[in-house]
Amino acid sequence: MDKMNPVLKQTILEVVNNQLEALDPPETKQTYDRLVASGISDQEARRLIGCVVSSEIFDVLKQQQPFNHARFVKALNKLPILPWE
């Protein structure tokens, strides 16, 4: 996500922030808490979650199917390993 267009990066991070504030989906906050508790910084935890958000958006657009909650949660649970690794 570091080489991403700055406007797109900010938008993805805004999605992450909104998910954390709304607790929707709750797995985003659970993942954030797990990452921070493991010693990952706030900023890095948000960036990692943003990578999962961007990966899910890519999959939705590529497959022309609705958001897949199970796939999203599976990717969150694997962090800090990124979806494409």
Predicted segments with their positions:
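Structure-specific DNA junction-binding interface
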Residues: 1-85
